[in-house]
Amino acid sequence: MQRESMEVDVVIVGAGPAGLATACRLLQMAQTAEKELSVCVLEKGSEVGAHILSGAVFETSALDELIPDWKEKGAPLNTRVTGDDVYYLPNKKSSFKFPNFLVPRPMHNHGNYIISLGNLCSWLAEQAMELGAEVFPGFAAAEILYAEDGKVKGVATGDMGVDAKGEQKASYEPGFEFHAKYTIFAEGCRGHLGK
């Protein structure tokens, strides 16, 4: 059974912060240049943000550049850091607070936000789609596709309806191919295609 395929300009594997920010920026640049650009983002999770480790302290300078009006657009950044402390824990029974002047500047989070990265990714996916991206949750890229000259030409999703022995069940459906001029791997630290 032959796989169905879709032709796009850019396919991005991974709908985390990096993949979605990339989709947004590429589409912003295309709009500025008055060029057509088809961007497709594949996410293995059943919904965007489902595979993101949740909590984070977020510094907004990158978001300020990417989407300057993020506050007006309802970005899920609601809880500002009002203070933070750093402790040394030499054993289970004692702790020592470092004086603030000894704490390295990058570890001071005053004015940053405490956020859910999953919620931020859901919101970034909305922004990317408003710009024209197609976002496909539940589409795990399983293999890299190569052209005859050895260049990457896209990715394919895994086949469905395959049993533990690798044999096709009655519900078998072949994976879907995404062919692209550019393939961007933003699958995170545990991504298997980038290995």
Enumerate the language-model features and the residues they cover.
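Extended hydrophobic secondary-structure segments that form protein cores and membrane-embedded regions
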Residues: 10, 38-46, 180-185
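Conserved Rossmann-like nucleotide-cofactor binding loop
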Residues: 18, 47, 190
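Helix-loop-beta segment of a Rossmann-like dinucleotide-binding subdomain
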Residues: 95-117, 126, 154, 169
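N-terminal FAD cofactor-binding segment of flavoenzymes
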Residues: 36-93
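Predominantly flavin-linked oxidoreductase catalytic cores and closely associated redox partners
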Residues: 33-35, 118, 123, 127-195
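Glycine/serine-rich loop-strand microenvironments at binding/catalytic pocket rims
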Residues: 1-13, 17, 132-139
